[in-house]
């Protein structure tokens, strides 16, 4: 009996990852399993990053996840040290006088004028 290789489901487009990899002149041929492995690794990385970001939002009793939560997750988690120089370039969304997070601007209909 010969078994067919099981197809691995990923949430990121394998064909696009392969195309990105091949666009680099330093990379020659790409094995068939490589983009799939990269897609799965990217998926696991994103799950970890999002979970840490959500934890930051929960610790601050926030109902919404904001960029400041992502920044704090990167700064406080050793696993994401390689992202620290990227997030440090972005300002915090914290009001300096009160230390509270800025409220997002409300979108929607304007109140009726009398």
Swiss-Prot record:
Pfam families in UniProt: CBFD_NFYB_HMF (PF00808)
GO MF annotation terms: core promoter sequence-specific DNA binding; protein heterodimerization activity; RNA polymerase II general transcription initiation factor activity
Main location: nucleus
Biological process according to GO: DNA replication; transcription by RNA polymerase II
Family annotation (InterPro entries): CBFA_NFYB_domain, Histone-fold, Transcr_DNA_Rep_Reg
Compartments (UniProt record): Nucleus
CDD domains, alphabetized: HFD_DRAP1
Entry keywords, A to Z: DNA replication, Nucleus
Region called Disordered, residue ranges: 91-114
GO cellular component, one term: negative cofactor 2 complex
Disulfide bond annotation, renumbered to this chain: none
Subunit field text: Heterotetramer. Consists of four subunits: POL2, DPB2, DPB3 and DPB4.
Known role: As accessory component of the DNA polymerase epsilon (DNA polymerase II) participates in chromosomal DNA replication.
Misc. comment: In eukaryotes there are five DNA polymerases: alpha, beta, gamma, delta, and epsilon which are responsible for different reactions of DNA synthesis.
Name by which UniProt lists this protein: DNA polymerase epsilon subunit C
Native source organism of the sequence: Yarrowia lipolytica (strain CLIB 122 / E 150) (Yeast)
Gene label: DPB3
